[in-house]
Regions:
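A cross-family phosphate/adenosyl-ligand binding-site feature
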Residues: 1-122, 127, 132-137, 187
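YjeF_N-associated NAD(P)HX repair module
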Residues: 119-214
Length: 214
Protein backbone atom coordinates (compact mmCIF):
# COMPACT_ATOMS: atom_id res chain seq x y z
CA UNK A 1 0.00 0.00 0.00
CA UNK A 2 2.86 2.39 0.74
CA UNK A 3 4.19 1.90 -2.80
CA UNK A 4 0.74 2.58 -4.22
CA UNK A 5 0.54 5.76 -2.14
CA UNK A 6 3.96 6.83 -3.43
CA UNK A 7 2.90 6.26 -7.02
CA UNK A 8 -0.29 8.18 -6.27
CA UNK A 9 1.85 11.06 -5.03
CA UNK A 10 3.88 10.90 -8.23
CA UNK A 11 0.61 11.40 -10.11
CA UNK A 12 -0.05 14.52 -8.04
CA UNK A 13 -2.36 13.10 -5.36
CA UNK A 14 -0.98 14.27 -2.03
CA UNK A 15 -1.04 12.18 1.14
CA UNK A 16 -2.97 15.03 2.73
CA UNK A 17 -5.72 14.57 0.13
CA UNK A 18 -5.68 10.79 0.68
CA UNK A 19 -6.10 11.40 4.42
CA UNK A 20 -8.97 13.79 3.77
CA UNK A 21 -10.72 11.22 1.59
CA UNK A 22 -10.11 8.43 4.13
CA UNK A 23 -11.48 10.35 7.10
CA UNK A 24 -14.45 11.55 5.07
CA UNK A 25 -15.23 7.95 4.03
CA UNK A 26 -15.37 6.84 7.67
CA UNK A 27 -17.62 9.78 8.57
CA UNK A 28 -19.96 8.89 5.69
CA UNK A 29 -20.20 5.32 6.95
CA UNK A 30 -21.10 6.50 10.46
CA UNK A 31 -23.73 8.90 9.10
CA UNK A 32 -25.30 6.32 6.78
CA UNK A 33 -25.21 3.51 9.34
CA UNK A 34 -26.37 5.34 12.47
CA UNK A 35 -28.49 8.33 11.41
CA UNK A 36 -30.30 9.99 13.01
CA UNK A 37 -27.42 10.66 15.36
CA UNK A 38 -29.43 12.71 17.84
CA UNK A 39 -28.52 11.70 21.40
CA UNK A 40 -25.65 9.49 20.18
CA UNK A 41 -22.27 9.88 21.88
CA UNK A 42 -19.30 9.31 19.55
CA UNK A 43 -15.73 8.97 20.80
CA UNK A 44 -12.90 9.07 18.26
CA UNK A 45 -9.77 7.57 19.82
CA UNK A 46 -6.65 8.75 17.98
CA UNK A 47 -3.01 7.77 18.01
CA UNK A 48 -0.21 10.19 17.17
CA UNK A 49 0.45 8.94 13.63
CA UNK A 50 -1.44 9.09 10.36
CA UNK A 51 -4.13 6.68 11.53
CA UNK A 52 -4.90 9.29 14.17
CA UNK A 53 -4.88 11.87 11.39
CA UNK A 54 -7.65 9.95 9.63
CA UNK A 55 -9.55 10.14 12.92
CA UNK A 56 -9.11 13.92 13.14
CA UNK A 57 -10.55 14.31 9.63
CA UNK A 58 -13.44 12.00 10.47
CA UNK A 59 -14.23 14.09 13.55
CA UNK A 60 -14.28 17.31 11.53
CA UNK A 61 -16.76 15.83 9.08
CA UNK A 62 -19.01 14.63 11.91
CA UNK A 63 -18.88 17.86 13.92
CA UNK A 64 -21.93 19.48 12.30
CA UNK A 65 -24.21 16.57 13.16
CA UNK A 66 -26.53 16.44 16.19
CA UNK A 67 -24.34 13.95 18.03
CA UNK A 68 -22.18 14.47 21.09
CA UNK A 69 -18.60 14.16 19.83
CA UNK A 70 -15.28 13.73 21.63
CA UNK A 71 -11.79 13.39 20.17
CA UNK A 72 -9.22 11.73 22.42
CA UNK A 73 -5.51 11.86 21.59
CA UNK A 74 -3.53 9.03 23.17
CA UNK A 75 -0.38 11.06 23.53
CA UNK A 76 0.87 14.62 23.69
CA UNK A 77 0.02 17.14 21.01
CA UNK A 78 3.70 17.62 20.21
CA UNK A 79 4.00 13.91 19.37
CA UNK A 80 1.80 14.43 16.32
CA UNK A 81 4.45 15.32 13.77
CA UNK A 82 3.60 13.99 10.31
CA UNK A 83 2.89 16.52 7.59
CA UNK A 84 -0.60 15.08 7.19
CA UNK A 85 -1.76 14.48 10.77
CA UNK A 86 -0.38 17.66 12.37
CA UNK A 87 -2.43 20.23 10.42
CA UNK A 88 -5.57 18.16 10.92
CA UNK A 89 -4.98 18.07 14.68
CA UNK A 90 -4.46 21.83 14.67
CA UNK A 91 -7.86 22.27 13.04
CA UNK A 92 -9.48 20.10 15.72
CA UNK A 93 -7.85 22.15 18.47
CA UNK A 94 -9.26 25.36 16.99
CA UNK A 95 -12.80 23.99 16.71
CA UNK A 96 -15.37 24.91 19.35
CA UNK A 97 -18.02 22.51 18.03
CA UNK A 98 -16.48 19.40 19.57
CA UNK A 99 -14.66 18.40 22.74
CA UNK A 100 -11.07 17.19 22.58
CA UNK A 101 -8.43 16.27 25.12
CA UNK A 102 -5.10 14.47 25.20
CA UNK A 103 -2.91 12.35 27.46
CA UNK A 104 -1.45 15.49 29.05
CA UNK A 105 -4.87 16.54 30.34
CA UNK A 106 -5.48 16.46 34.08
CA UNK A 107 -7.16 13.24 35.24
CA UNK A 108 -6.81 11.80 31.74
CA UNK A 109 -7.39 8.15 32.72
CA UNK A 110 -10.58 8.89 34.62
CA UNK A 111 -11.90 11.20 31.91
CA UNK A 112 -11.11 8.67 29.18
CA UNK A 113 -12.81 5.82 31.02
CA UNK A 114 -15.88 8.01 31.53
CA UNK A 115 -15.94 8.90 27.82
CA UNK A 116 -15.76 5.26 26.74
CA UNK A 117 -18.37 4.11 29.23
CA UNK A 118 -20.96 6.59 27.96
CA UNK A 119 -20.17 6.13 24.27
CA UNK A 120 -22.54 4.68 21.67
CA UNK A 121 -19.99 4.61 18.85
CA UNK A 122 -16.20 4.34 19.17
CA UNK A 123 -13.93 5.06 16.22
CA UNK A 124 -10.58 3.29 16.54
CA UNK A 125 -7.89 5.49 14.99
CA UNK A 126 -5.03 4.39 17.24
CA UNK A 127 -2.65 2.32 15.11
CA UNK A 128 -2.40 1.78 11.38
CA UNK A 129 -0.24 -0.46 9.24
CA UNK A 130 3.03 0.62 10.86
CA UNK A 131 2.56 -1.20 14.17
CA UNK A 132 3.51 -4.89 14.36
CA UNK A 133 3.83 -7.30 17.28
CA UNK A 134 2.45 -7.23 20.79
CA UNK A 135 0.86 -4.07 22.15
CA UNK A 136 2.56 -2.49 25.15
CA UNK A 137 1.16 -0.31 27.91
CA UNK A 138 -0.55 2.10 28.15
CA UNK A 139 -2.09 1.13 24.82
CA UNK A 140 -2.87 -2.43 25.92
CA UNK A 141 -5.10 -1.19 28.75
CA UNK A 142 -6.72 1.31 26.39
CA UNK A 143 -7.61 -1.42 23.89
CA UNK A 144 -9.02 -3.65 26.63
CA UNK A 145 -11.24 -0.78 27.76
CA UNK A 146 -12.51 -0.29 24.21
CA UNK A 147 -13.24 -4.00 23.84
CA UNK A 148 -15.17 -4.08 27.12
CA UNK A 149 -17.43 -1.25 25.99
CA UNK A 150 -20.94 -1.97 24.72
CA UNK A 151 -20.45 0.70 22.05
CA UNK A 152 -20.28 -0.09 18.34
CA UNK A 153 -16.60 -0.09 17.33
CA UNK A 154 -15.54 1.21 13.91
CA UNK A 155 -11.87 0.62 13.05
CA UNK A 156 -10.10 2.94 10.63
CA UNK A 157 -8.03 1.01 8.05
CA UNK A 158 -7.57 -1.98 10.38
CA UNK A 159 -8.30 -2.85 14.01
CA UNK A 160 -5.46 -1.45 16.12
CA UNK A 161 -2.90 -4.16 16.79
CA UNK A 162 -3.75 -6.41 13.84
CA UNK A 163 -0.81 -7.18 11.54
CA UNK A 164 -1.96 -6.16 8.03
CA UNK A 165 0.36 -8.63 6.31
CA UNK A 166 0.04 -11.79 8.41
CA UNK A 167 -3.26 -11.32 10.23
CA UNK A 168 -1.55 -11.85 13.59
CA UNK A 169 -3.82 -10.46 16.30
CA UNK A 170 -2.02 -9.86 19.60
CA UNK A 171 -3.82 -9.94 22.92
CA UNK A 172 -5.16 -7.34 23.21
CA UNK A 173 -6.22 -6.22 19.74
CA UNK A 174 -9.21 -4.02 19.01
CA UNK A 175 -12.25 -6.17 18.20
CA UNK A 176 -14.17 -4.12 15.66
CA UNK A 177 -17.79 -4.41 14.63
CA UNK A 178 -16.85 -2.79 11.32
CA UNK A 179 -13.46 -2.14 9.73
CA UNK A 180 -13.20 0.47 6.99
CA UNK A 181 -10.04 -0.07 4.99
CA UNK A 182 -8.91 2.04 2.06
CA UNK A 183 -8.36 1.53 -1.67
CA UNK A 184 -8.03 -2.27 -1.43
CA UNK A 185 -8.29 -4.95 1.22
CA UNK A 186 -5.20 -6.16 3.07
CA UNK A 187 -4.13 -9.77 3.44
CA UNK A 188 -4.27 -9.65 7.24
CA UNK A 189 -7.92 -8.59 7.20
CA UNK A 190 -9.06 -11.75 5.46
CA UNK A 191 -10.30 -14.65 7.59
CA UNK A 192 -10.23 -12.56 10.78
CA UNK A 193 -13.92 -11.79 11.11
CA UNK A 194 -13.94 -12.02 14.92
CA UNK A 195 -11.44 -9.13 14.96
CA UNK A 196 -12.36 -7.26 11.77
CA UNK A 197 -16.16 -7.56 11.88
CA UNK A 198 -17.87 -6.28 8.74
CA UNK A 199 -15.21 -5.29 6.17
CA UNK A 200 -15.79 -2.19 4.05
CA UNK A 201 -13.31 -1.15 1.34
CA UNK A 202 -13.57 2.59 0.68
CA UNK A 203 -11.97 4.40 -2.29
CA UNK A 204 -9.78 7.38 -1.42
CA UNK A 205 -9.14 8.75 -4.90
CA UNK A 206 -6.10 6.67 -5.87
CA UNK A 207 -6.48 5.85 -9.60
CA UNK A 208 -5.66 2.47 -11.21
CA UNK A 209 -2.50 4.04 -12.64
CA UNK A 210 -0.94 3.93 -9.17
CA UNK A 211 -1.27 0.15 -8.98
CA UNK A 212 1.68 -0.43 -11.28
CA UNK A 213 5.13 1.08 -11.63
CA UNK A 214 5.81 2.69 -14.98
Amino acid sequence: MKQIEKRGEALGISKLLMMENAGAAVARYVIERFSPLTDKHIVIVCGTGNNGGDGFVCARHLAALPASLEVVLLGSRDQVKTAEAKPNLEIILRMKSLESYDADSANFSQQFEKSINKSDIITDAIFGTGVRGDIKEPYASTIRLLNQSKAYRVAIDLPSGLDPATGYAPDPCVKANTTITFHASKKGLMGNREIVGELVVAPIGIPPDAEFSH
